[in-house]
Amino acid sequence: MSKNRSLLLIFTIVIFDVVAANGLGALLSDYVLNLPNKPILLTAGTAVMLAIQLALSPAIGYWSDQRGRRPATIATTITSLLSNLLLLPVQSWGYLANRCFKGATNGLYSVMRSAMADQTEKDELLRYSGLLSFIAGSGTILGPMVAGVLMLVYSGGRISPIPTVILLLVIGALNIGLAFLFKETSPKEEPVERKEIVKKATNALKVVSLWNQLAEADKELPGIKPMFILNMLATLGMGYYAFFVAFMTQSHLIMTPREAAWFFLEYGSLAMLANFIFFTYIVTHVNKRKTILFLSMVGVVMQGLYAFSESSQTMFYVVAGVDAITVSIMTGLTGSILSVMVKQGGSQGEMFGNIQALGGLASFVTALINSLLSGVSMKAPFIFCGLSMIAVFVWAMRLPENARKYTDAKSMEELEEEPAEA
């Protein structure tokens, strides 16, 4: 399989998985219809998924390093399909069980990042990994965007979640077929002991152990730890993505499933277009740290405007449009820089798994905090995300020199030229 076809397959597998995992959008409220504190429960489902991801992503990444990327890809796509079967009974227990199983398969994204790193050079990896990081991190936007098309063309899809669930099952089945077509990018047949897999998973739950592994990696590749902290702060700042459904359906906006579908179609389309243009044509020509500083300040303003858009759908749409073409680029940008650094350090699958696990921890924290804050005020989660954006700005300003080497270089190929110039 040619490199271009392989990369296209990687993107398709990730997009299909993201849609299959997050496609219900506003219809998720049907699963908690008769329960109190619906905004809290809607966001709590995401928190449960990310907590399980924390344990299993490093284990899946390690498995892909030992046995290859293809077996891990096939196994996670099959499990992802099975998890969506739990959504057929429209019950709260089915939704929570689905989130638990989905958390067990989110290691797929670290495997796909590893497969991409296996076959691309630094500047290619910067561009492609940026797009992949955006797609994987924007599931709560892109999933409802794609599934929203069904709601717009078929009225039954706005009344019951079942037609959408069937669509997600079809997408999941197609993804299994794509996984079997995926050619190995890191052929290995090294033995994997069950004890070692369990050890990786249990160590991941000990966040201190993961943090210590990151500190060790920083000794071999100086700069990766502060860059990862920047990525975590950006993840905290983007936590409002998982809050959108609760905000649109449970706040004074009271948007219908049809209106929510139009919103996700607008936001998702603009964000995908902005990220495609940026990572295809711009990323290798700009100072990435200055770009992050600019985006974080725009993010602070956007969060303030979101907090006061509850009374006006028009204002909400305008703010979201500006947000989509600017701030949505941030997590892809920090994630792509990390991917280049990990490629230099080796042990890609396990390291990507650790990064996804700790990134999942950041997402879990923001989902949990937003769940609790939404019980106080629907504005409060945006205030928290705004404060996180300020933290991104401050940390990027104080980024140490060994990390700035990566963020300030326009082309990643410049990094190889430095020793020769010295």
Where are these regions (language model features)?
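Conserved MFS/SLC helix-loop-helix module at the cytosolic interface between two early adjacent transmembrane helices
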Residues: 55-91
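Helix-to-loop junctions at the C-terminal end of transmembrane segments
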Residues: 57-68, 274-288, 374
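Cytoplasmic helix-loop-helix junction between adjacent transmembrane helices
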Residues: 98-136
